[in-house]
Amino acid sequence: MRRLRRILAQVLALMMAFAMPAAAEEQNMDARVDEVFRASNAVGGAFVVAQHGSIVYERYYGIQQKTTRVPVSEDTYFRCASVTKLVTGIGLMKMMDEGILDPDEDISTYLGYTVRNPSFMDTPITLRMLMSHTAGLVENSSFASQVSILSDMIDVKKKAGSNFKTDVKPGSEYAYSNFGAGITGAIIESVTGMDVSSYMRKTLFDPLGIDAAYSAAQLAHPENIAAVYNKDGSLYLAPSYMLRQQYTQEARPDYHYRVTIGRLLIRPRDLARLGIAICGDGTVDGVRVISGEAVAAMRREHSEETDGITADSPYTFFTIRQDTLFEGLRVYGHQGTDEGIVCNLYVEPENELVIVVMTNGCNTKRDDGIMRITRRLAAIAEDVYIKGNVE
């Protein structure tokens, strides 16, 4: 009996010997991550890392909103600004897999009216152009207005030329376009007969057990919505305002085009799970999200021969190719910012690494195009999960 106790004690000591360094390593990483959030004046934030198909690290910092002082947690929904485009892009790729959409079809076919740059009437505008930001749209047009009607702005019969660059042939020039991303949402509604948020929930989010929405009112736990703050820490959007934002759960492509620009609300772990899908073969937790061919297409550069796009765009299907985040490695993903929001989702396929950075307000300084806070957090992930430097 004494011998058995002695053996059990030795086993327990051995287990503790392994566990203690691991715990110490995680505490050290927590401290490093917290320091980045602190130095960036973040009100609240989240950093999630996944590798080899599983979430391996997550850290939540600060508060959801200053009035309630509720801490940020894995249950917090963040508004993810332009990362909305990448998530919408995954939904669009799924529709392409299913044969509902063709990336090279004239979008007029889907919208039910003729969309043309009046200076290039023989050149159709395609979904591929919209998703690579090469459609030649004017970004400072009336699309930003809450009452603008989409068809009034792009239907050639309504003399909508002011919303196009009249000296730029569609497909020939890269120019980042929020408006173009909005049009893709209108296409989803026109084709499916459903509002874009409900369609994405039904076809993409629900099968994965993800609670996310383009309308705050559709979320299961709206009490967990993070406020949005300006760079200086002042309030920009309260959760109560987001819940009151006008949104009708029926197809209204002439109006709902605004939501796919940047209104998605999602929890950090769920965004990381979508990242796992596009980092690998299109599956997550055994569920097929998109085909492996679709994942490959999101990473491939366009060419004139295969796609009819002559522009040198860093985006393919709302996915940017980025070569400066990790040393000697290419990552794919998207960045989002709106006032003080920072949201980044990047995947690095060689090491099967996914990183998610989300804040509800912080310093939005950039280094070589990428948010400084994201570069600093990515450096920690690179150090630990790629280089294996654990202190």
What do the predicted segments below correspond to?
Residues 38-46, 68-129, 166-179, 259-262, ...:
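Short active-site loop at a secondary-structure junction
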Residues 20-25:
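Sec-dependent signal peptide cleavage junction
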Residues 65, 119-337:
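Short, surface-exposed loop or secondary-structure junction motifs
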Residues 26-78, 100, 158-164:
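Short, conserved catalytic-motif segment at the N-terminal edge
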Residues 361-391:
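Short, gly/Ser/Thr-rich active-site loops of penicillin-recognizing serine hydrolases
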